[in-house]
């Protein structure tokens, strides 16, 4: 599936996609955080209505295309380090980085595809 997203998505994201089932708003928190190498980092995403497990987590670095980390809420994309994990279903989802590495400093965001047009 081609999941193109604007490059300017940063920080707190309020994402919605029109579709047959009503627009679904995604709210991510925190909007920003300070962390150090070795820290455990948790980012949450809440849907305005249930989306089963139809959620992906992406990493984006400046000037680079978004990289899919987690699909179907908790499945690790091939080649992604095991320190990344995802959990949740319905409306509440979490991305966890178990031990932050220097290459992990980036923007992270969730994207639902429950009602992808």
From Swiss-Prot:
Q: Note down the stretches annotated as region Complementarity-determining-2.
A: 72-78
What are the record's GO terms for cellular component? extracellular region; immunoglobulin complex; plasma membrane
InterPro entries per the UniProt record, alphabetical: Ig-like_dom, Ig-like_dom_sf, Ig-like_fold, Ig_sub, Ig_V-set, IgV_Light_Chain
Protein task: V region of the variable domain of immunoglobulin light chains that participates in the antigen recognition. Immunoglobulins, also known as antibodies, are membrane-bound or secreted glycoproteins produced by B lymphocytes. In the recognition phase of humoral immunity, the membrane-bound immunoglobulins serve as receptors which, upon binding of a specific antigen, trigger the clonal expansion and differentiation of B lymphocytes into immunoglobulins-secreting plasma cells.
Q: Where is this region: Framework-3?
A: 79-110
- Chain positions covered by the region annotation Complementarity-determining-3: 111-117
What does the record note on quaternary structure? Immunoglobulins are composed of two identical heavy chains and two identical light chains; disulfide-linked.
> Where does the secretion signal sit in this chain?
1-22
Q: Region Framework-2: what ranges?
A: 57-71
The Ig-like domain is annotated at 23-117
Q: What is any Pfam family matched here?
A: V-set
Residue ranges for the region (Complementarity-determining-1) are 46-56
Renumbered to this chain, region (Framework-1) spans 23-45
Q: Name one GO biological process term.
A: adaptive immune response
The molecule here is called Immunoglobulin kappa variable 1-6
Protein's cellular compartments? Secreted; Cell membrane
Q: Which UniProt keywords apply?
A: Adaptive immunity, Cell membrane, Disulfide bond, Immunity, Immunoglobulin, Immunoglobulin domain, Membrane, Secreted, Signal
